[in-house]
């Protein structure tokens, strides 16, 4: 099985430097262009199904990538970005004085501290691991397109490679690119990371 990984295109929150987990934030014109470019790069990729975050920025990206193709789609909450609670659509400069104690605790110990009324890294990790455990349900598929978010995709790569969850930072998943992980007999191999090349059958 191959997992094709695509991060949503650039959003208005990305440009503004805001924390955007579950809060709606539309794709910018650049983000739309990134998704359309991926449509061209992956035109010949033989997707059996697409698994997508519930969030509109990911769903919009998926629609653009797959425009003109009839690929069955599954919307999965496990693929949603980490939820930042009261910090959603806020800038870190504001949080340093508006929620100073909690934000300082999170910056010091991001693996265990929890954003105010949000989702901690441990809960986020368990959610992504639930998604991994569900991959067996798609064992009839050879090629799954996964459209999600940087946090989810970086963590997904780390855990599939049996690395600690905190290793996600080693795998920055860029916008406008595609990545691929091959899974054979339960063993995952990272084959492509952040490619801007046209995929062609080998």
Swiss-Prot record:
Pfam families: His_Phos_1 (PF00300). Keywords: Cobalamin biosynthesis, Hydrolase. It catalyses: adenosylcob(III)alamin 5'-phosphate + H2O = adenosylcob(III)alamin + phosphate; alpha-ribazole 5'-phosphate + H2O = alpha-ribazole + phosphate. Gene3D superfamilies: Phosphoglycerate mutase-like. The active site is at residues 8, 81. Its EC number is 3.1.3.73. PROSITE patterns: PG_MUTASE. One of its GO terms (molecular function) is phosphatase activity. GO terms for biological process: cobalamin biosynthetic process. The keyword Transport does not apply. Belongs to the phosphoglycerate mutase family. Catalyzes the conversion of adenosylcobalamin 5'-phosphate to adenosylcobalamin (vitamin B12); involved in the assembly of the nucleotide loop of cobalamin. Also catalyzes the hydrolysis of the phospho group from alpha-ribazole 5'-phosphate to form alpha-ribazole. Monomer. This is Adenosylcobalamin/alpha-ribazole phosphatase. It comes from Salmonella typhimurium (strain LT2 / SGSC1412 / ATCC 700720).
């Amino acid at each position: 099985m191959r997992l094709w990984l695509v991060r949503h295109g650039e959003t208005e929150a990305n440009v503004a430097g805001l924390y955007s987990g579950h809060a709606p934030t539309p794709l910018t014109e650049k983000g739309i262009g990134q998704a359309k470019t991926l449509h061209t790069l992956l035109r010949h990729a033989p997707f059996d199904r697409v698994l997508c975050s519930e969030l509109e920025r990911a769903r919009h990206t998926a629609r653009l990538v797959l425009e003109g193709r009839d690929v069955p789609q599954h919307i999965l909450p496990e693929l949603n970005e980490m939820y930042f609670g009261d910090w959603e659509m806020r800038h870190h400069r504001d949080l340093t004085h508006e929620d100073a104690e909690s934000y300082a605790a999170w910056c010091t110990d991001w693996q265990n501290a929890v954003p105010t009324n949000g989702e901690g890294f441990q809960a986020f990790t368990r959610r992504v691991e639930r998604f991994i455990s569900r991959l067996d349900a798609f064992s009839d598929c050879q090629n799954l397109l996964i459209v999600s978010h940087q946090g989810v995709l970086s963590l997904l790569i780390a855990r599939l490679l049996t690395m600690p969850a905190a290793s996600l930072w080693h795998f920055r998943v860029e916008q406008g690119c595609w990545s691929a992980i091959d899974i054979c007999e339960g063993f995952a191999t990272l084959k492509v990371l952040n490619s801007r090349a046209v995929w062609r059958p080998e």
